[in-house]
From Swiss-Prot:
The keyword DNA damage does not apply. It comes from Mus musculus. Residues 111-142 are annotated as: Disordered. This is Zinc finger protein 2. The keyword Nucleus applies.
Length: 427
């Protein structure tokens, strides 16, 4: 099926002005540097989104100014020449066939993103010239996207058949193929580690312009995506989509091995490492590997001895915030989860589940070396040190090493009785 040609509008070119937001000189002066940087990033991203539709869009003066690292033109574009973007210029486009099909949503987002920069502005529509912004049910706040369906309903993307013949951009590192050269360049940054987009506020670097745009919202305080159910706001649409599944209960990502379902793909990926045994995050200090980056981060603290999360009530410190939150329930609330067998109560469901295995005799964690099974993963980990000879707990007084924390605590009690603290000094 042949691709449908773009809407005629007297066969005129779709210009950048059709989706541009302009500022007066006074409005521009009121923007702080980080807002100007966000405006620049969004304008470039918007222009490239239109280019991705495959239409011969002229290159306006405002884009030329940005490319030269200059200030943007303030009101209007002062007679931009109608010339197409040269094919030799590499654009940083997030373009896939499926996203081309969603071009209407992309152009609607152009107006939504720009609406947060300045309260007074002109909005160029796709159906005519400049018109003042009107408050409608779909545009009451800057957090709601404007409805531009009327001017967009005729616009169509090139057919997939026309696009597939261009899928000849292959990564030399991993063999993955892409539909355009710019997508290949962006992908290759995952191998090279290149991050060409710097935040002017804090200096943090990013590999994608869209990631920089999202990050800049942290500095401006903008959270444009709001949950209708609870009012919580997010910096990007994907985070809002994942959050809304908490309210709907939808878990579209299912594990093929055990059938467990998850709200997002990243949680499924982390879970699947339990089945595959993959541990991609390795400690450079001791060589120990972990399935999740957060676990490695927490593990690194055991080498420094630093426990950054301290309880305000009793002063006890912890390596992770989840451990602190679990501990603080001791001070603030009663244990809610009670064992029906023995009456013992717990603060969280996972602790109760672990405890109930004592009564059921369930031992799902089996040692690969000797076949011995355990009811808890931590007990299996402790047991495996018998085979590996690992002794990660070292006494700060005498240097003796132990395979379990309980053993070193028992050992250090001897020094406590002698009046020697854990640092080795007399109290």
């Amino acid at each position: 099926m042949a691709a449908v040609s773009p809407p005629t509008r007297c066969q005129a070119l779709v210009t950048f002005e059709d989706v541009a937001v302009t500022f007066t000189d006074d409005e521009w002066k009121r923007l702080v540097p980080v807002q100007r940087a966000l405006y620049k990033a969004v304008m470039l991203e918007n222009y490239e989104s239109i280019i991705s539709l495959g239409l011969p869009v002229p290159r306006p003066d405002v884009i030329l100014q940005f490319k030269r690292r200059g200030e943007p033109w303030i009101r209007g574009f002062h007679g931009s020449e109608e010339k197409t973007w040269p094919e030799s210029v590499s654009l940083d486009l997030e373009t896939k066939p499926e996203t081309l099909d969603a071009s209407r949503g992309t152009l609607r987002e152009i107006h939504r993103k720009q609406s947060s920069l300045c309260p007074k502005r002109e909005i160029q529509t796709l159906t005519g010239g400049p018109e003042p912004e009107k408050e409608s049910p779909k545009a009451r706040t800057c957090k709601k996207p404007l409805s531009l369906d009327k001017g967009l309903h005729q616009m169509s993307a090139p057919s997939k058949k026309a696009l597939t013949k261009h899928q000849d951009q292959e990564c030399s590192e991993c063999g993955k193929t892409f539909f355009d050269h710019s997508s290949l360049i962006r992908h290759q940054r995952t191998h090279t580690g290149e991050k060409p987009y710097d935040c002017p506020e804090c200096g943090k670097a990013f590999s994608h312009r869209s990631s920089l745009s999202r990050h800049l919202m942290f500095h401006t305080g903008e959270s444009p995506y709001e949950c209708d159910a609870c009012g919580k706001a997010f910096f990007d649409r994907s985070s809002l989509t994942v959050h809304q599944r908490i309210h709907t209960g939808e878990k579209p990502f299912k594990c093929n091995d055990c059938g467990k379902a998850f709200f997002d793909r990243s949680s499924l990926t982390r879970h699947q490492r339990i089945h595959t045994g993959e541990s991609p995050y390795e400690c450079q200090q001791c060589g120990k590997a972990f399935s999740q980056k957060s676990i490695l981060t927490r593990h690194l603290l055991t080498h420094t001895g630093r426990k950054p999360y301290e309880c305000r009530d009793c002063g006890k410190a912890f390596y992770g915030v989840t451990s602190l939150n679990r501990h603080q329930k001791v001070h603030t609330e009663e244990p809610r989860y009670q064992c029906s067998e023995c009456g013992k109560a717990f603060f969280d469901r996972s602790s109760l589940t672990q405890h109930q295995k004592i009564h059921t005799g369930d031992k799902p964690y089996e040692c690969g070396e000797c076949g011995k099974a355990f009811s808890q993963r931590c007990r299996l980990t402790r047991h495996q040190r018998v085979h590996t000879g690992e002794k990660p707990f070292e006494c700060s007084v005498c240097g003796k090493e132990f395979s379990s924390k309980s053993s070193i605590i028992q050992h250090q009690r001897r020094y406590a009785k002698q009046g020697i603290d854990r640092g080795g000094s007399m109290s």
